[in-house]
């Protein structure tokens, strides 16, 4: 068996990504805007409204064809 060491890999670059963040104070729900299912999503954890936000994350591309703009 081989042992693969991932510690030698460089970390992926982070950048500011637009997100939707839950407005409920005790909920940590959030989602990337390009992965949201609607233009005004509800929190998937508690069902509250979500507002615009920005987080420093690794950039991911959404290749899904389900959302059309």
UniProtKB/Swiss-Prot annotation:
Pfam families for this protein: YdjO (PF14169)
Classification via InterPro entries: YdjO (IPR025916)
Subunit text: Interacts with the RNA polymerase core.
Name this polypeptide is given: Uncharacterized protein YdjO
Organism listed in the record: Bacillus subtilis (strain 168)
């Amino acid at each position: 068996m081989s042992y693969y060491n991932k510690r030698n890999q460089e970390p992926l670059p982070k950048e500011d990504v637009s997100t939707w963040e839950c407005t409920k104070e005790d909920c940590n729900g959030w989602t990337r805007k390009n992965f949201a299912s609607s233009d005004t999503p509800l929190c998937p954890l508690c069902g509250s409204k979500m507002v615009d936000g920005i987080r420093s994350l690794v950039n991911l591309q959404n290749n899904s064809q389900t959302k059309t703009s």
